[in-house]
Amino acid sequence: MAVFRHPVSGEDYIKRVIGLPGDRIQMIDSVLHINGEAVEMEPAGTFVEPYGPQGPQGRMPRCFNDATVGLGGTCEKERYLETLPNGVTHSVLNVGYSSRADDTAVFTVPEGEYFMMGDNRDNSTDSRFSQAGGGVGFVPYENLIGRANRVIFSSAGRSLLFFWDWRGDRFLEPIE
């Protein structure tokens, strides 16, 4: 996991480094492919969170059970364990098929740049999306800040004051 500055907005982001210079990255039917090889995925249960505005922008999460969940209800997402070619295994979340995010062209990572993806794949505006379209696009080396090792604080709400939305079970947890 890397902390980096968004190439356009300058805001700090945390995403997983998926592609190094020269790598070819593609999503085919919701499965990540690196250099032509499908990344191993195995089902790992369901991720559950409250359905409501999240983060400073107050965006509503996408849920696998969108049709049946209402404000304050339970948002469910399929959880998978994904194992990258370097042997690192981490959780990813899936809420269903999106042609823009789950079936992409091949991205060839340019020299001096990196390809980033969020683990909450269907709620992540990452390198699969161009900077002109509001995405991260490729991230230049000089925008990398460092490595993220732990979750210091986690909330499903819009404000730090909404203590009832705090996810205490994630405080100080290591990042996979």
Residue ranges and their predicted role:
Residues 1-176:
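Soluble "head" domains of membrane/secretory-pathway proteins
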